[in-house]
Regions:
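Start-of-helix register in tetratricopeptide repeats
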Residues: 20, 54-55
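Conserved structural position within tetratricopeptide repeats
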Residues: 6, 10-13, 47
């Protein structure tokens, strides 16, 4: 997972506005159990337009993060965004 994390970090520097890059970075941090960094990257992805929330909720790479209190706060933010679009 460490090699993937290095690639994702590099991509985040090269493409700072790409939501998918930050989403993938969140996944890498989750898999390496760096949960604060994972939550931060996931928030950046959402702020930059990531909206595939169904995938986010099922993605095995984010499972470690979903087991933390940090994710509960993100899920609340997602619910608010979903309510705005209904």
């Amino acid at each position: 997972f460490k090699d993937g994390l290095q690639v994702d970090r590099r991509l985040a520097r090269l493409c700072p506005e790409d939501p998918l890059v930050h989403y993938n970075l969140a996944c890498s941090f989750s898999l390496t159990e760096e949960f604060r960094k994972s939550a931060h990257a996931l928030r950046k992805a959402i702020q930059r337009g990531y909206r595939d929330f169904d995938h986010l909720r099922r993605d095995n790479d984010l499972e470690p993060l979903r087991q933390t209190d940090l994710y509960a706060a993100i899920e609340q933010e997602i619910a608010e965004l979903e309510a705005e679009t209904d």
